[in-house]
């Protein structure tokens, strides 16, 4: 079979930078799926993307589908011939339709009888006749929420399309993509190199674009180049660039020919909290801030131009002029905000509605304050600081700085709290109340911060469920799933001795009587348990392990986590499989017992050696297990229980549980019930697979 390399490029107007990677990856995934469906073999496939193009390169693509043998089954032999052995009309019609005679047909014997068959050879279709349609289908399936039309073209895409190129080796493949006829024309950089040129071969794409068109089409290469040059530029001025990957991705999606430059701003702006300056540099201008070895912001920034200028100083000056007003705004807001304490802003919270049925932000901070103090008392944190931090927690939302730079909420609250003379615990809690903000973010570790963060999230969860607005499907306008995971992570990762039922009840009490959903507390608990399952599954914990623990309904997250870890460890032990099966057998036996289960074991009724041995082993272990259960040392407890395997196996081998003698039967049921209860102190081991 012959092979060639394939290049498909779509030339467009500037594509949305935050969508560029997803578009390119989806285009590749959709197209390779088409190749697989069409039975077209290929070696590998990669995507390329730049602001004004999406491209795919497939190496060693088969030039045609492989020939196939297709079995075409005809009538049963019993109905294909008459009594004289002559072909029936049905058989002749089938044979004629397949271009053969009845005599040329083969026979196929199955368990349902004997049939006429024809194994027809179907020649594979040439790749070049399939490519354009497959590429169009791949484009049609791209995740584009708001497609647009342009000119007189009825076709829709995320941005106007100007060129389409499909090359199989050196051959131009005829066809259209999004209404644009395939041609060799590829567009270069807007301001450098050739505006457009003819591409002779699929293999020349990257090199020709770079040399002739001044475009680095390989997204990953462009991204790596920006990162390396930015790091070098920062090192030259004695600093380290803050190169967050999401910003690096966005910048790489904005430029075709990256040129890294260093600029500066006036040192007077460093009197403003660095987070506000960084916010405007990164968020508004797409600049990389620079920090010294001590983590202090330097009066410099690194930016990426999309052109090689003969006068880079002019570009640098232009960017400095652009950022200065934004930094001046931050300075003005900071100096203005400092004139008022956070406490003085409390009355203004009454003007901001949190939710129609749940009141204003002032109502919310009052609830947070009380709940945070309640939590702090249980965890040993400073309840006075927790109450104070809870009360002030949303006041920075009323500052000029946060209104303008919304992502600085909490952080600016911390700075303003310090300026107001609040305790450090209160100040830190102002910032950490929102943690974790995203998957992989850290959780607060300070006691007061944990109390306020938990109180805020629980107040929202209980309140929103209380008015019957639980998340439905993918919709989650109040980010309750994130809040729930936050609650669980804060408690688990800090090993806090908190019970969800108690916390939910307290939060519900603080909401008063305006919650209409009488089942809110149960629904919130179920919601948190469901998040527990999802969280542990994401961490690679087996579903059976999670279900085994969930069966015991532990409502203390730290305790839940200890059980998960213990059962995960237990499952790795050699004895776990046999003991899980034994527990399942015990559960099935006990489930059939009518009425209350017997619990008292009479040693005098232990007549069989195997039941005597099991009872003795349980009696030996129970004094050791009791303190382990009390201290939640579940892993050690299950390790000890794993030692019961031989005794349990022997018991089921030698002992008839459901004996005719009622007293013997009940005694053995009591023994099995006792055995099961030891495991149930941790989890329902019978659910392990």
Curated annotation (Swiss-Prot):
Source species, domain of life: Bacteria
Catalytic function, reaction form: tRNA(Gly) + glycine + ATP = glycyl-tRNA(Gly) + AMP + diphosphate
Any one GO biological process: arginyl-tRNA aminoacylation
Keyword field: Aminoacyl-tRNA synthetase, ATP-binding, Cytoplasm, Ligase, Nucleotide-binding, Protein biosynthesis
Broad class of where this protein is predominantly found: cytoplasm
GO terms for cellular component: cytosol
Enzyme class: ligase
Presence of keyword S-adenosyl-L-methionine: no
Cellular compartments annotated: Cytoplasm
EC numbers, comma separated: 6.1.1.14
Record carries keyword Membrane: no
InterPro entries: DALR_anticod-bd, Gly-tRNA-synth_bsu, Gly-tRNA-synth_heterodimer
A Pfam family this chain is assigned to: tRNA_synt_2f
A GO molecular-function descriptor: glycine-tRNA ligase activity
Protein family per UniProt: Belongs to the class-II aminoacyl-tRNA synthetase family.
HAMAP family according to UniProt: Gly_tRNA_synth_beta
PANTHER family reported for this sequence: GLYCINE--TRNA LIGASE, CHLOROPLASTIC_MITOCHONDRIAL 2 (PTHR30075:SF2), GLYCYL-TRNA SYNTHETASE (PTHR30075)
Subunit structure: Tetramer of two alpha and two beta subunits.
Protein name: Glycine--tRNA ligase beta subunit
Source organism (scientific name): Shewanella sp. (strain W3-18-1)
Gene name for this UniProt entry: glyS
């Amino acid at each position: 079979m012959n092979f060639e390399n394939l290049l498909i490029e779509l030339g467009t107007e500037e594509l949305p930078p935050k969508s560029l990677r997803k578009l390119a990856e989806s285009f590749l995934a959709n197209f390779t799926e088409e190749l697989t469906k069409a039975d077209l073999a290929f070696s590998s496939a990669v995507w390329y993307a730049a602001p004004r193009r999406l491209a795919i390169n497939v190496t060693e693509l088969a030039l045609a589908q492989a020939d196939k043998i297709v079995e075409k089954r005809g009538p049963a032999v019993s109905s294909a011939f008459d009594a004289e052995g002559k072909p029936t009309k049905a058989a002749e019609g089938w044979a004629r339709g397949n271009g053969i005679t009845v005599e040329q047909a083969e026979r196929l014997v199955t368990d349902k009888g004997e049939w006429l068959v024809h194994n027809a050879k179907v020649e594979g279709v040439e790749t070049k006749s399939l490519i354009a349609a497959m590429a169009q289908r791949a484009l049609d399936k791209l995740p584009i929420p708001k497609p647009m039309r342009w000119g007189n073209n009825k076709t829709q895409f995320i941005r106007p399309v100007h060129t389409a190129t499909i090359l199989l080796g050196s051959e131009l493949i005829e066809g259209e993509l999004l209404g644009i006829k395939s041609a060799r024309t590829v567009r270069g950089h807007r301001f450098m190199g050739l505006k457009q040129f003819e591409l002779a071969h699929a293999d020349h794409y990257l090199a020709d674009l770079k040399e002739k068109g001044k475009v680095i089409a390989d997204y990953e290469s462009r991204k790596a180049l920006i990162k390396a040059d930015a790091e070098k530029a920062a090192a030259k001025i004695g600093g380290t660039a803050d190169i967050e990957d999401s910003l690096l991705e966005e910048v790489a999606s904005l430029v075709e020919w990256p040129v890294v430059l260093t600029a500066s701003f006036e040192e007077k702006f460093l009197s403003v909290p660095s987070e506000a300056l960084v916010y405007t540099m990164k968020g508004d201008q797409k600049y990389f801030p620079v920090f010294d070895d001590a983590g202090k912001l330097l009066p410099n920034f690194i930016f990426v131009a999309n052109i090689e200028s003969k006068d880079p100083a002019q570009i640098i000056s232009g960017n400095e002029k652009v950022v200065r007003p934004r930094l001046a705004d931050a300075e003005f807001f900071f100096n203005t905000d400092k004139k008022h304490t956070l406490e003085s802003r409390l009355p203004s919270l009454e003007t901001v509605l949190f939710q129609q049925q749940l009141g204003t932000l002032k109502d919310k901070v009052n609830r947070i304050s009380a709940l945070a103090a309640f939590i702090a008392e249980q965890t040993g944190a400073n309840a006075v600081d927790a109450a104070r931090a809870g009360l002030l927690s949303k006041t920075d939302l009323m500052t000029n700085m946060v209104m303008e730079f919304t992502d600085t909420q909490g952080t600016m609250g911390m700075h303003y709290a310090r300026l107001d003379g609040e305790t450090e615990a209160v100040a830190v809690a102002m910032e950490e109340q929102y943690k974790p903000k995203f998957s992989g973010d850290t959780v607060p570790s300070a006691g007061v911060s944990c109390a306020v963060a938990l109180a805020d999230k629980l107040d929202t969860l209980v309140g929103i469920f209380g008015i019957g607005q639980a998340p439905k499907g993918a919709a989650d306008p109040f980010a309750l799933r994130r809040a729930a995971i936050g609650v669980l992570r804060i408690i688990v990762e800090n090993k806090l001795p908190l019970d969800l039922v108690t916390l939910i009840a307290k939060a519900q009490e603080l909401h008063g009587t305006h919650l209409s959903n009488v089942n809110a507390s149960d629904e919130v608990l179920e919601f948190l348990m469901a998040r527990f399952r999802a969280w542990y599954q994401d961490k690679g914990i087996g579903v059976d392990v999670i279900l085994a623990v969930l069966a015991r309904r532990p409502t203390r997250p730290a305790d839940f986590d200890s059980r998960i870890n213990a059962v995960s460890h237990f499952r790795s032990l050699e004895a776990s499989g046999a003991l899980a099966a034994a527990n399942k057998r015990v559960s099935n036996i006990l489930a059939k017992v009518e009425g209350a289960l017997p619990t008292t074991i009479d040693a005098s009724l232990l007549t069989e050696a195997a039941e005597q041995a099991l009872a003795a082993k349980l009696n030996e272990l129970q004094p050791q297990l009791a303190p382990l259960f009390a201290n939640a040392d579940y892993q050690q407890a299950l390790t000890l229980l794993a030692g019961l395997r031989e005794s349990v196996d022997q018991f089921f081998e030698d002992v008839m549980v459901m004996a005719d003698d009622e007293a013997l039967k009940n005694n053995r049921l009591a023994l099995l019930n006792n055995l099961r209860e030891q495991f149930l102190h941790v989890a329902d081991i019978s659910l392990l697979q």
